[in-house]
Every structure is written in C-alpha cells, then in structure tokens.
Swiss-Prot record:
It is found in: Cytoplasm, Cytoskeleton, Microtubule organizing center, Centrosome. The modification Phosphoserine is found at S326, S466, S472. This is Centrosomal protein of 68 kDa. SUPFAM superfamilies: Spectrin repeat. Residues 1-253, 339-474, 511-545, 590-611 are annotated as: Disordered. Keywords: Cytoplasm, Cytoskeleton, Phosphoprotein, Ubl conjugation. Residues 1-17, 86-96, 399-416, 433-450 have a biased composition (Basic and acidic residues). One of its GO terms (cellular component) is cytoplasm. Phosphorylation by PLK1 is required for binding to BTRC in prometaphase. Phosphorylated directly or indirectly by NEK2. NEK2-mediated phosphorylation promotes CEP68 dissociation from the centrosome and its degradation at the onset of mitosis. Interacts with CNTLN; the interaction recruits CEP68 to the centrosome. Interacts with the SCF(FBXW11) complex which contains SKP1, CUL1 and FBXW11; the interaction is probably mediated by FBXW11 and the complex also contains CDK5RAP2 and PCNT. Also interacts with F-box protein BTRC. Interacts with serine/threonine-protein kinase PLK1; the interaction leads to phosphorylation of CEP68 and its subsequent degradation. Interacts with NEK2; the interaction leads to phosphorylation of CEP68. It comes from Pongo abelii (Sumatran orangutan). Disulfide bonds: none annotated. One of its GO terms (biological process) is centrosome cycle.
Length: 751
C-alpha cells in the first residue's frame, strides 16, 4: 500500500513539474489539502506586519507569482496544476487532535523576488497494525527559496521531485514518524524561510541558516496553520482563510510567535472595515444625499478605529476629556466645560468630595466659589484655571447668598442716621461734600461697623477688588471687573440719593429746604443759589426713609446754609457768574407745595416694609390714568347689563332670578366703590395741581419766549463794547448813542 502511494506521488509530481516547465512561471499552485467536510475549524493563515484580507478564492490558495513570458492579466486557471484526487484513498476514519500551533515562519530579505511555488501535497502515512486507530499525521510544508536545499534527517526526501523555476528551488516534503510502540504521532514543524544561499532542515523543526552569513532582519512572516482532521471523503478540504488573530506556538516554539502584540492587529483593523460601504436606495423617497455623503465619509475616514458602538450607546460611554480625538464626530463627546465637567471627580480624582462640590457646573449649590465685585462667580465653567486653590476659598456661612445686601445694610443705616430730617438740608456743607467722597458715617455707626468687621467683612472690601488682585488665567470672564465696579457704584449712589426726603411739613409751606416764593423779576431757575437733585431722587416724607421711590420729575430747590449763601448749583458748576442772570424760583416753590399724597395720609405713623408714604407727580398721574381706565371699562360692562336686563315677572322663578341679579349688581357696585372714590380724589388733586400751576406754566412759557430777545440784546451790548475798545485803540471817537448797523437793522423781540 505504501509503494502504491509513493508511485502516485511520483506521477503527480512529474505532471506538476511538466506543467511548470511548459508555463515558464513559478505561478499559482493549488494547495489541495484533504480535510473534513463540515464541523471542524477552518485553517487560518496568519500575517504579521502586513495587510490581512480575505483573498482566498474557490480554487485554492493563489500565491504571489513571478511571471516569465506570460500575460499577467490572463486567467489564473492556466497556471494551476490539475491534481488527480482519484488515487487518494481515505486512510483515517477517526478524529485526531488538531494541531495546536506551529512555530512562526521567518522570511528573510534575501534574493526572494516575490516568487513562490506550491506543489501538490499528499499524505504519506505508514500503516501500523499494532495501533487500533490509524491516525493521520500532520504534514509539514517547507517553502524555501535559494539555490539548493539540504536534507539531514530523512534521506528519502532527496528522492522527491523538485520543480525548479528561474533559479529557485522549491522543496515539498512530508515526514511521517510513526513508531511501533508510540500511541500518538509527533508532528513536524512548518517554516517558510528565505536565504541568499539556501536552507537546511534540521530535526522536527526546519530552521534557516545563512551560508554566507548575510541573513537580514526579519521583516514579515507568513504562517499557514492547517489543522489535521481525518478525511473519509475523497476531495478538497476547507480552504485556508486569512485570520487577524495571532496564533502562538506550543512549548518549544520559537520566540517570534511570542512577540506578537495586539496593537499590530488593531493597527490594520482601522484599514480593513468589517462591513460594506453604505449603499442606500436612491430611488426611495426617504433617500437623503447629504446623509449618504456623511455616512460615506465616516466609513472611509473613521475617527475611532476598532469596534464601533451604536450611537445610542456611544453617546453614554465615558471618555477621557484630555485625550479626546478632535474631529467632526465630537457630537457625543466634547472638550467644552459644559459636557466634560459634569462629573468633577473624573477630572480631579484625588480631590476630596468636599472640594469637588465647589467645582463649576457641579450643581446649584456652590458654597465656596470666589465672588467678583458684583457677586458673579469668578468662573462660569472652564478648564483654564490657574490653580486648584483658586476654585475653593473660605466657605460662607449658611444664608450667605444675601451677604452682599447684608453688607450694604450698615452703610444704609449710617446714611439714614446722619442725614438731617428735622432741620434745613445744607447741600454745600462740608459734611455732605465729605460724604460724597468717602461716605463717612457718624462715630457710633463707625464703631458699630468696626465691631462687626471682625466677624463679617465690609461691603466695600468684598466688592472693590482691583483687576491685579484677582489671580486668574481664564480669559473668559462673566463681566470685566471695571464695568462691575461701575454698575455697583451706580446702584450704591442711587440707594443713597433716595434717602433725601421731604418731611410732611412741606405741604404746609414749612419746608426745611426753604423755597423762596417772593414776587419780583423772574427768570429761569438756573442761578447759583439753586441746586438740582439727581434725576433718580425721590421727594418723600419723613415717614418712609428706607423705601425706594424713583422720581422722574426734576425738582429745583434752593438750599440756604447758616450764612445765607448759596452753594452747589448748575450755574456754579458751569462757571457762570451769579450776577449775570437773575432768576426767581416760583416754579419749584409751587411744585414743591402741592401734595403728592392723599390728605388723610398726613397724620399716619411712618410706614415700613417698603410702602410709599408719598407719591410723586408722575406716579400719581399714572395711578389716576390706570384707575380711570378700569372704571370706564366697568361702567361699559354695567351699561351692557342694564340695557339687556328685563323687568321682573309675576311668577316665582322670575322673582328669584331678579333678586339674584340685584344682589350681584349691588355687590359689584360695593366692590367698585373704592375705585370710584380713588379716581375722584386723585382727579381732584390733579385738577387742583393744574389750576395752581397754570399761571406758573404761562409765566415759564412767556419767559422762554423773551429769553431769545434778552440774549440778543446782551450780544449787541457785548459787540458795542468791543467796537468801542477798537475805536479807542485807533484814536477815533464815535457818538455814544450810535450803534452798529447790524444791531439797528435787527428787530428787537420781546422788548
């Protein structure tokens, strides 16, 4: 039986040899490996350091070819030998343990010109009658490139046919080492090597040894792992397939297999996609060309190589915010503070939980953030922090959210204490001027605030920090410090200016501001003996010193000091001489005399809780207009009800409905009685105010009309004086009564 198999091998080798000589190429050969038909693990071809792709066809394993005088584009079937499988007989009928692993093959950088040749392999088995089972031994294939090949173990291997082509020799060997006393065969190794001089086969493992001593470094290796299974059916076995998983050898394998790393497989995993490119149905009404283009870009240029998760899972997978890929696929993860700092413990894992709660965007409760002058947190969320100590400071006490307004209360109380209420207000006094600069408080209040400074910093120290004191490298601030200070200053001065009050005695003409109401030549109230309150100041009574009542009416008041001299005023601020214009403050006097509140509110106690004891003129007009509009609408509704109402009938149901309608109507009248009285009262007040101010308004309009003529005459007199001075310099004398022609021709208005 063994002789018959050797004969069949020789015939098949001679046929293959003849075909290879006829074709003139070391072209593609078909590796015919008998194996199981189903149920076993397919062979794997391992590639290290190179591309792995499913390149196996239905015909076998196409190897790289070296074309000599042939057309590369021709069909590959012409270069494949016709292996006769009819002479094969099934020898083993039981299973055999598969080959666990082979030592990795080494491929040197010799004179191998991408030409390899594979011959038909057949199994050479020795029938052992002493074993109950005849295992099929694993085959060993050694593809060598060189000028000659040596065999050292088995002298019968030299008798095997060889197929030389283009100076290359290919050796196909089979080893069968059954021992009569052994129960299991010993598999031989498989190695693919290239050398400049040749190769030698030693023992059960064929190793490549350079004869010239010029073996290059290992560049790539190709390993063919073919598990041996019993074959009961004559024919081709499963085709080897490319597999990206590394295969390691057994106990006595070489060290090259152990040097296989996982990153090599991952390196090529991003190049070879595991799915087909997107090909949507373009005839479908749901086809979106933009979506197809985006999918094609994602398929061609993947940003995250490796296994891709679905979008609904990928958006919830935590990622490293520092080592995140920067690309167009950052919709799921972003390096912005709004998305990466949601969990502060991920960014600062070594921080204690108490400090982690002080991070920006960690939650609504941020007890230890530094405050800008306006109370805005220093960081609105950002990674560019100077140090971790800047994020945390001394924790504030509970209820410290309103600490800013609590800091303002001492200043407000101090201003309330020092402002004079029962005596004339001196707008030009040294105390007021000093208060404008530094806002000092009386001595008791200063001592009180000094005692409070030990347990709570003052509002000025907490809100007035310069830009140099704030240590921060973040360029994105909520508001610039300068603008914040200006806004704080405006609000602070506005709260102080509202404390200027007018007592209730002002209604009776006993104002502490002592407004002059004498008759005489009058002009615009713009002299140096007058002062103008800020536009936001409110004229209020002494009953409400703490409430804020914005006044839109500019009140011109005249304040006299103890010496009877005028102080701060608009004309003095402009540098205009006080004797140039003569004024009479009749308008401010009359405006200050009219009552802004209801007459019944004069004798009441001071109100608290922010209620307004006195109302300004503008607020009174607004209130009157709103109430009048409401009253008119209600009267229209009442007219509609009364017009559509019907008289009561004699039956009981009609009487009940009429009685119910009467009760509702009476109740509605009672509810709107107060509205009616308020409209009447405020209307009378406004009418009285208009009547009192009618002559004042007429006087003001007449003065405005006369001002143009007065200014023109003053300009003419100034021009005459200039001409007189020029004439005196020139030595000419003019008649004193003579006036310039321009002044004579110009009409005099208002004289």
């Amino acid at each position: 039986m063994a002789l018959g198999e050797e004969k069949a091998e020789a015939e098949a080798s001679e046929d293959t040899k003849a075909q290879s000589y006829g074709r003139g190429s070391c072209g593609e050969r078909e590796l015919d490996t008998p194996g199981p038909m189903s149920g076993e693990q397919p062979p794997r071809l391992e590639a290290e350091g190179g591309l792995t792709s499913p390149v196996w066809g239905a015909e076998g394993i196409p190897a790289p070819t070296c074309w000599i005088g042939t057309d590369p584009g021709g069909p590959s079937r012409a270069h494949q030998p016709q292996a006769s499988d009819a002479s094969r007989e099934p020898v083993a009928e039981r299973s055999e343990p598969a080959l666990s692993g082979l030592p990795p093959a080494t491929m040197g950088s010799g004179d191998l010109l991408l030409s390899r040749e594979s011959q038909v392999e057949k199994t050479k088995l020795s029938a052992s009658e002493e074993l109950p089972q005849t295992p099929s031994l694993p085959r060993t294939t050694t593809i060598c490139s060189g000028h000659d090949a040596d065999t050292e173990d088995d002298p019968s291997l030299a008798d095997l046919p060889q197929a030389p082509s283009s100076g290359l020799s290919c050796l196909s060997q089979w080893k069968s080492m059954p021992s009569p006393g052994s129960a299991a065969p010993q598999p031989s190794s498989c190695s693919v090597s290239a050398s400049s001089t040749g190769s030698s086969l030693q023992g059960h493992q064929e190793r490549t040894e350079p004869r010239g001593g010029s073996l290059a470094k290992v560049s790539s290796s190709l390993e063919l792992v073919v598990p041996q299974e019993p074959s009961s059916v004559v024919g081709l076995g499963p085709r080897p397939q490319w597999s990206p998983q590394p295969v390691f050898s057994g106990g006595d394998a070489s060290g090259l297999g152990r040097r296989r790393l996982s990153f090599q497989a991952e390196y090529w995993a991003c190049v070879l996609p595991d799915s087909l490119p997107p090909s949507p149905d373009r005839h479908s009404p749901l086809w979106n060309p933009n979506k197809e283009y985006e999918d094609l870009l994602d398929y061609t240029y993947p940003l995250r190589p490796g296994p891709q998760l679905p979008k609904h899972l990928d958006s919830r997978v935590p990622a490293d915010p520092v080592l995140q890929d920067s690309g167009v696929d950052l919709d799921s993860f972003s390096v912005s503070p709004a998305s990466t700092l949601k969990s502060p413990t991920n960014v600062f894992p070594n921080c204690p939980p108490a400090e982690a709660t002080a991070l920006p965007l960690s939650g609504p409760r941020e007890p230890s953030l530094k405050q800008w002058p306006s109370g805005v947190p220093q960081k609105q969320g950002g990674m560019g922090l100077a140090s971790w100590s800047q994020l945390t400071s001394t924790p504030r006490a509970p209820g410290s959210r309103d600490a800013r307004w609590e800091c303002r209360e001492p200043a407000l109380r101090g201003a309330k204490d020092w402002l004079p209420i029962g005596k004339p207000l001196d707008m030009g006094s040294p105390q007021l001027r000093t208060r404008d600069r530094g806002w000092p408080s009386p001595r008791p209040e200063r001592e009180k605030r000094t005692s409070q400074s030990a347990r709570r910093p003052t509002c000025t120290e907490s809100r007035w920090k310069s830009e140099e004191e704030v240590e921060s490298d973040d360029e994105y601030l909520a508001l610039p410090a300068r603008l914040t200070q200006v806004s704080s200053l405006v609000s602070y001065i506005g709260s102080i200016s509202t404390l200027v009050t007018l007592p209730a005695g002002d209604i009776k003409g006993q104002s502490p501001l002592e407004v002059s109401d004498t008759d005489g030549p009058a002009s615009l109230p713009s002299s140096s003996s007058q002062s103008q309150l800020p536009p936001g100041a409110a004229l209020r009574g002494s009953g409400d010193p703490e409430g804020q009542n914005p006044c839109f009416l500019r009140s011109f008041v005249r304040a006299q000091d103890s010496a009877g001299e005028g102080s701060l005023g608009s004309s003095q601020a402009l540098g205009v001489s006080s004797g140039l214009l003569k004024t009479r403050p009749s308008l401010p006097a009359r405006l200050d005399r009219w009552p802004f509140s209801d007459p019944d509110a004069e004798g009441q106690l001071p109100r608290k809780g922010g209620e307004q004891g006195k109302e300004s003129l503008v607020q009174c007009v607004k209130t009157f207009c709103c109430q009048l509009e409401e009253l008119i609408c209600w009267l229209y509704n009442v007219a509609d009800v009364t017009d559509h109402g019907t008289a009561a009938r004699s039956n009981l149901t009609s009487l009940k409905s009429s009685l119910q309608l009467y009760r509702q109507f009476k109740k509605d009248i009672d509810e709107h009685q107060s509205l009616t009285e308020s409209v009447l009262q405020k209307g009378e007040i406004l009418l009285q105010c208009l009547l009192e101010n009618t002559p004042v308004l007429e006087d003001v309009l007449g003065r405005i009309a006369k001002q143009s003529g007065e200014l023109e005459s003053h300009a003419d007199r100034l021009y005459d004086s200039i001409l007189a001075s020029l004439d005196m310099l020139a030595g000419c004398t003019l008649i004193p009564d003579k006036k310039p022609m321009a002044a004579m021709e110009r009409p005099r208005e208002g004289v």
